[in-house]
Design a protein with these regions (language model features):
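Conserved small/polar residues in nucleotide/adenosyl-binding loops
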Residues: 302-307
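Polar low-complexity intrinsically disordered regions enriched in Ser/Thr and small residues
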Residues: 14, 113-115
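Long all-alpha helical scaffold domains
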Residues: 34-112, 121-252, 256
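Eukaryote-biased recognition of C-terminal alpha-helical segments
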Residues: 268-300
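Extreme N-terminal leader/anchor segments
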Residues: 1-32
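Compositionally biased low-complexity segments, especially N-terminal hydrophobic helices
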Residues: 9-10, 116-121
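N-terminal low-complexity segments that are often proline-rich with Ser/Thr-Pro
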Residues: 309-311
């Protein structure tokens, strides 16, 4: 549930805005708890904030539905992709609200689902808390779209699509996860002692996880593209360069996951990175290097960018 809090008062919050008529407070809890803390209760009599909290929870429900779908079947992956896209729509709708501004509420005709179409109604509210802010909504939109694209990629793999199609879908996944990582990294560089910061609402392991996933899908795309490049004298050098960069990027991501003080990503994500590094990237790279040394003798021009990846 979303936090619609105002000022703290003994672990509870209450909106002290102008009251007219019957005062009916709506209670919610923080979506995420601060490190080592508990989710605090929020109470507000603002209908506008109640609508925002409902939008947040609609997005949360859709993303939960997507996460629980059967990813081993095409039907399950289609459900996941559609639900993640709907969740992104709700969070994008929510993100039209920002501190001190009005909320533009837009519903698609007849469907009752959020869209990015022109606004049909506006609701003014005085202040929006961090977990309902435009910045937080942008993070959630990007994350849901990345997971929707990942579901499309997995469905394409199950359908035995061509390497060209899979490479395009994989690089789209990598780009989306890179976008999420950038947004998360930006939001996590605030003052940790501030009473309301993004650190309180975003699990820090998300940044590490999205960094690794971006490397995984970059490797998925690279491996498929290089299956063709390694068999041509004119392109084997490019293949070796791409595979080497992908190898260094994955190794950089895995080193980040091993930092003792860093938040730990899910074990399955780390294992996926280790598997594609070992079974695809290193295997294809070793084969390409041997073929080049024995047959093609292509000149290799390569500058490592692993340091740049680690600093990102």
């Amino acid at each position: 549930a979303a936090n619609t809090s105002s000022e703290e008062n003994n672990g509870e919050y209450e909106d002290e805005g102008t009251r007219t008529g019957l005062h009916l407070p709506f209670e919610w809890k923080d979506a995420f708890a601060p490190a080592g803390g508990e989710r605090k209760i929020a109470a507000s009599s603002s209908i506008a904030k109640e609508k925002l909290a409902m939008l947040y929870n609609l997005g949360a429900c859709e993303s939960a539905l997507a996460a629980k779908s059967d990813r081993s079947t095409l039907d399950g992956l289609k459900v996941a992709s559609a639900a993640f896209q709907r969740a992104a729509g709700y969070f994008q709708f929510l993100g039209q609200c920002d501190d001190g501004k009005k909320v533009n509420e837009t519903m698609s005709a007849g469907s009752g689902e959020p869209t990015a179409a022109t606004a049909t109604a506006t609701t003014g509210i005085d202040r929006i808390e961090a977990d309902l802010s435009g910045k937080m909504a942008a993070i959630l939109v990007a994350l849901c779209l990345a997971q929707a694209q990942e579901s499309v990629f997995e469905a394409a793999k199950l359908s035995d699509k061509s390497n060209g199609v899979l490479a395009k879908l994989a690089i789209a996944c990598a780009d989306l996860y890179e976008e999420v990582h950038e947004k998360l990294s930006s939001s996590l560089r605030g003052n940790p002692k501030a009473p309301v910061t993004q650190e309180r609402y975003v699990p820090k392991m998300w940044a590490t996880t999205t960094f690794i996933k971006a490397a995984i899908f970059n490797a998925e795309a690279t491996a498929r593209v290089c299956e063709t490049l390694v068999n041509d004298e004119e392109t084997i050098g490019s293949a070796i360069t791409l595979l080497t960069r992908s190898k260094e990027r994955l190794e950089s991501a895995l080193r980040r996951a091993e930092i003792p003080t860093a938040p730990k990503p899910p074990k399955l994500v780390v294992e996926a990175a280790e598997n594609i590094l070992r079974d695809s990237i290193k295997f294809e790279l070793g084969k390409a290097v041997r073929d080049n040394e024995c047959v093609y003798m292509a000149c290799l021009l390569y500058t490592s960018d692993a340091a740049d990846e680690e600093d990102s």
